[in-house]
Amino acid sequence: LTFDGGTVANATGEILDTLKATGVRATMFLTGQFIHRYPELVRRMVREGHEIGNHTFSHPRLTTFAVNRRQDTLPGVTKEFVQRELRRMSRLFEEVAGTPIGAYWRAPYGEHNREIRQWAAEIGYLHVGWTRDLSAREDLDTRDWVADPHSPIYYRAEEVRERILNFGKGKVAQANGGIVLLHLGTQRRQDRVHRELEAIVDGLRMQGYDLVPVSELHRSLALGQGGKGSAVAAER
């Protein structure tokens, strides 16, 4: 399970309570803005054993995807810009948490390409996305960030739960190696996805899955023990 934290943290306390109650350690991809606004929540994440990944400092757009559905690097997005965003977040995290950040990052809005990933890799970061099965047209993006119930990509909380629990059914790897994308804040006034988190955890465990931080998944993939569809292996 992975959670992105941009600027809103109104679901974070409940999420951390649920993860603690169920004994799950997750990976949190945080921006520098999130760390600046919510230092106590960040320290709690670290104290309770969660892994922190880099989500840049200011959550900028990096590619043209929002304009033309292509992942072309935006004008002005340079190696220096990307590395500065990652380093600023890393420095602030270490100041607040008293420990270095891990080696994983996630691009804002899922906007990245080989060039951008290489720039990040040059300063020690491996990109982590979320699981997509293009052949089946399904993925593990919960869409919990979609607040408008009339949107064609809106899913009710119970629909999100069922999409996760049924992901990969009938396939050899099933959801093994899968990475789920959730968020630490929401604009939904009701039907909040994180309220289904305990049921999601219980359902996945009943199917025999272990829920681990990204670093443990990455190690298992390196040893040949993970699923083929992992977004860690696919986006080096």
What is the predicted function of each stretch?
Residues 1-70, 74-77, 85-103:
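Active-site beta->alpha N-cap acidic-glycine motif
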